[in-house]
């Protein structure tokens, strides 16, 4: 009986270590995938558009924890191809600066990020979105902007044809199916923004876990009134769900070990009583 009890607690401990290792690895992998394309810290304007982004990026980069900064334009849109229409989040970027804050270069299934050239209206889309639209590198697709044009016939949405110059596969459905990248200059033209206006500035930190502290310290360095957020708030629900799952698994496995330990104690008590 004692051997069986010992075997039970051994299996329980093995299960605990294995499951916790898998969950920790899963959390680390998910975090790496999400934060590979999302920002550690994000600076946006209180008024919707951030003017003079160069100043904001320069001031933020003075913080010792900041590794790189890059501007972006973010807006809603719809893509149309092969009579299929799909809503997307359009992100206008500067490819050379984006490489410093994101990991898109290592996720490209075809094409390259630096194929986004201002004025040529190229677009990089996710693998799931490409499958939905039936689009391949080199295809022409139509981007529909919700900011319409006023005509005698009424308000009409703005349409612009883009060429697919790349397809990325991050491994996260939300991004692979709903995010597209275009050059920031093309995004500014499409959404009628001035050359020095952007949606915000994205920051990459040397230590991503220092993000909450950096958010508290950055306002002292910035001249313009800005709203600053970090990845722990932007993706809080997702990582909180993983943490709750880890705790519940730990509780269940701890109960298994407790039962096995109780069996050992009971066996020892019986042995002592018999003697």
Q: Where in this protein do the model-derived segments appear?
A:
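Mechanotransmission and gating elements of multispan inner-membrane complexes involved in transport
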Residues: 147-148, 155-249
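Short aromatic/hydrophobic contact patches that present stacked aromatics
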Residues: 40-42, 122, 200-202
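Membrane-interface junction motifs in transport/secretion proteins
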Residues: 27-57
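Hydrophobic C-terminal alpha-helix "anchor/cap" residues
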Residues: 34, 59-64, 218, 222
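A common structural microfeature
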Residues: 8, 38-40, 66, 87
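A structural signal for hydrophobic secondary-structure junctions
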Residues: 54, 58-196
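Hydrophobic alpha-helical transmembrane segments of multi-pass inner-membrane transport and secretion
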Residues: 2-24, 243-275
């Amino acid at each position: 009986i004692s051997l069986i009890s010992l075997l039970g607690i051994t299996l329980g401990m093995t299960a605990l270590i294995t499951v916790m290792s898998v969950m920790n690895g899963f959390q680390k992998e998910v975090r790496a995938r999400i934060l590979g394309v999302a920002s550690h810290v994000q600076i946006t304007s209180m008024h919707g558009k951030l003017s003079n982004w160069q100043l904001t990026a320069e001031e933020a980069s003075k913080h010792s924890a900041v590794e790189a900064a890059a501007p972006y334009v973010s807006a809603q849109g719809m893509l149309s191809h092969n009579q299929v229409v799909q809503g997307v989040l359009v992100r206008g970027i500067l490819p050379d600066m984006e490489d410093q804050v994101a990991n898109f270069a290592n996720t490209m299934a075809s094409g390259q990020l630096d194929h986004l050239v201002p004025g040529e209206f190229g677009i990089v889309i996710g693998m799931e979105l490409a499958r939905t639209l039936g689009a391949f590198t080199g295809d022409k697709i139509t981007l529909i902007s919700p900011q319409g044009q006023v005509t005698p016939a009424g308000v009409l949405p703005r349409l612009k044809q883009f060429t697919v110059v790349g397809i990325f596969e991050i491994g996260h459905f939300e991004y692979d199916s709903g995010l597209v990248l275009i050059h920031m200059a093309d995004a500014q033209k499409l959404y009628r923004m001035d050359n020095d206006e952007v949606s915000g500035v994205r920051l990459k930190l040397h230590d991503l876990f220092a993000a909450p502290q950096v958010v508290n310290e950055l306002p002292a360095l910035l001249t313009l009134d800005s709203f600053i957020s970090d990845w722990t708030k932007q993706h809080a629900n997702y990582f909180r769900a993983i943490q709750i799952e880890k705790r519940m698994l730990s509780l269940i496995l701890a109960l298994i070990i407790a039962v096995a330990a109780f069996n050992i104690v009971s066996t020892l008590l019986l042995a002592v009583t018999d003697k």
